Amino acid sequence: MSRGKNARDDDDVSRLLAAAAKTISHVRYCWLLTGAIHARPMGHVMSDPDDWHIRFVTGSRSRKAADIRNAGRIGLIFQHDPSEAYVALTGAATLVGASEVERLWKPAYDMYFPTETDRVNATFIQVAVERMELWIRGVTPEPFGLQTTELARNAEGTWRFSDRNLKGSKSNADSG
């Protein structure tokens, strides 16, 4: 693979990651799906778009917390209709410990955990995003919605086009 092709792929991946982060920042709620086919809308807190860790506050005694303890993998779906942008993320999910809950806690969460018992049983789901599927009008290849653009994080943490990416999608990105 030529150095120019690598640089072009890096630029394309950076552009796609920026568009995905922008989409997520515009969406107040997303769907969180566990392997047990349980899904529910969740308000999200994205720590830093560069590290692709997303957190949610939840009760440690909830069904979704139990699902995460059992499976440790989840999917997240974000949809921003005004910009015709759709982002599906998958990754490893963990429940953070008490000291991390204290560090991340904000007074705004008290309304969802009104009693001391509720607050003691609060935790954060932390998702380390490993893969993403993107459909973002004006960013992913045309014709819009017919091909999925997939990115995957390698062992070093670098984002690349997924091996499962359709060749047509990748070549369309290369031609621009």
Q: What do these predicted regions represent?
A:
Residues D9-Y29:
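Short, basic/aromatic recognition patches
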Residues V13-L17, T58-S62, D110:
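Charged, amphipathic alpha-helical segments
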Residues A39-P41:
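Positively charged, polar, low-complexity stretches
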